[in-house]
Amino acid sequence: NDIRHNLSKLHRNIEQVAAAGAQLVVLQELHNTSYFCQTEDTDMFDLAEPVPGPSTGFYSELAAGYGIVLVTSLFEKRAPGLYHNTAVVFDKDGSIAGKYRKMHIPDDPAYYEKFYFTPGDLGFEPIQTSLGKLGVQVCWDQWYPEGARLMALKGAEILIYPTAIGCLLYTSPSPRDISG
């Protein structure tokens, strides 16, 4: 969980895609670190930060510096004992256009997110940006269609789900490894 290394890598990658003409950049779920929710570890709470906070300052500068709309996913510490998996959207000028706190929190052998996160309380409100209205939710929320429906009914033009699914490390061969 080398945050400085991850931020440096994210900065380089954002710079690359912005130079290639990207206007909207969506980072994966909980991108400041590797996905830590596969175990229950109280030390991981040290990774949480307020919103706004250090990471939002960093991403605000990137959005403004490259003139992009940027969607991030952060481990938010809202208050002592109150933590969220929060998507924060930055407009092209670096301002925080809005945020969404993940509502559907998985808890199974691969995802111990209920150990870390409280379900969100901000509802399903599209976020107005210079590119249009974004319907932002986070990962597991995509399996519950009512959020997408409510966002669309309220005018969302694009649905976005930062997700960590697909970046998990396999302990057995992946289907690609055994397909021959």
Identify the function of each model-found stretch:
Residues 7-14, 146-148:
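Short, acidic/polar
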Residues 3, 12-92, 99, 166-172:
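Cys-nucleophile CN-hydrolase/nitrilase-fold catalytic domain and related Cys-dependent amidase chemistry
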Residues 49-51, 78-158, 162-172:
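Active-site catalytic loop in hydrolytic enzyme cores
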Residues 170-180:
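Single conserved hydrophobic/aromatic residue that forms the stacking wall/gate
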Residues 41, 145, 180:
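Loop/helix-junction capping segments adjacent to catalytic residues or to phosphate/diphosphate-binding pockets
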Residues 67-68, 132, 176:
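Generic structural signal for secondary-structure transition and capping sites
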Residues 35, 105-108, 180:
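Conserved protein kinase catalytic core
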